[in-house]
């Protein structure tokens, strides 16, 4: 158990990378009667750390499949066994939903690496974290929104930042521009329930209460993109709208749903 205890010490001190490097050595060891328990507990701990970070899902899946089959008879590790089963089940769900939304390579060039992308990003949205944020917000998030954040990255700056429109806005005659999409969480400043959340835009900037703010624009707050729940209720499938403060908070529909909104994004050529 020495490896696991040392890794827990590193994690408690915020030294996650050291803990991961230490625990990874267990994946490479040959299992014996003497080390079986230590390898099992270390593998489960490492799997949990990586899963919570949204990393190395195929490797975790294979490792958990292996140890769950080999160590059913191992005593005194019931907690770890149940944790392993939980992670394995959630990864099974993750892999089974691949391709549900955004067919083809439509997301290949969505995100842009930028200095302040972390304002929008948050920790990996496990099902438990998604449920907690939905409870905080009081809205059910679109499945395609959750899918995007789980299968690409949880918020950030977009490279394809133009959205076509059929009417003019304060930005352009035929499009609006967005800067970043808010990740699911409450740690990033511009995450869905971070400091610059929907309540901030409603209370401080006067935006109408139509649902959830999900993306900001280059105008630094003078126009925003929202999920519009007015017609579907807080648990329904919301439309995506643009709200223009410079035009007396004019509301313009951009897409029937979030998936259609993402698929409509393109890179403006100047």
Put a short name on every predicted segment:
Residues 21, 59-62, 66:
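Primarily a tetratricopeptide repeat
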Residues 38, 56, 76, 80-83:
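Structural signature of alpha-solenoid helical repeat junctions
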